[in-house]
Amino acid sequence: ANKESLVVGGEYVMRLAAEKRAPILPIDSEHSAIFQCLVGEQSPIRRLIITCSGGAFRDLPCEKLADVTVEQALRHPQWEMGAKITIDSSTLVNKGFEVIEAHWLFGTPVEKITVLLHPQSIVHSMVEFEDGAIKAQLGTPDMRMPISFALMYPRRATRPGERFDFMAHPQLTFAGVDRAKYPALEIACECLRRRGTAACTMNGANEVAVA
């Protein structure tokens, strides 16, 4: 239920899970989406596509980032979350950690993991296959859905309440991530390439920086 375990010790967690034949079911909405897209698939994938809202400063020019406040960083445009993860979302540190998490959960090299800005947070993630087909998992930004999926898998819970309305979301947009504006994303990818304790060091540095 936390990504840091896989960020700092993914190699050991996944090795132990394999030895004990213990499946790991993701709860993060992005990784739950990928998992759901992979259920029943036997063919290798071309890439994983992880989406992100862009956080509180998505529409803010780079030159104005030096003047932002903590209060501004805590205003996430889509999700209601704790303070630490909301700050990490504003810097895309959280998304970088999710790339590391996806690498360990699905055995996908960093070169085959793409991050796209998706302001509406409706498409939670996608999987592209070698034949060009892309599967996506869509839904409102509500953590109850990935949590219930993990708890009930392989069945699905019956959830009362309002259903997703496509007419209320007529436009879904996507864009590439500005790596200069969000350097933490590339740092996380580089940690994966370096292996060893690099990701653990990044996590520790971020814990101190955000505290």
Residue ranges and their predicted role:
Residues 1-211:
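Catalytic, metal-anchored helix/loop core of enzyme active sites in primary metabolism
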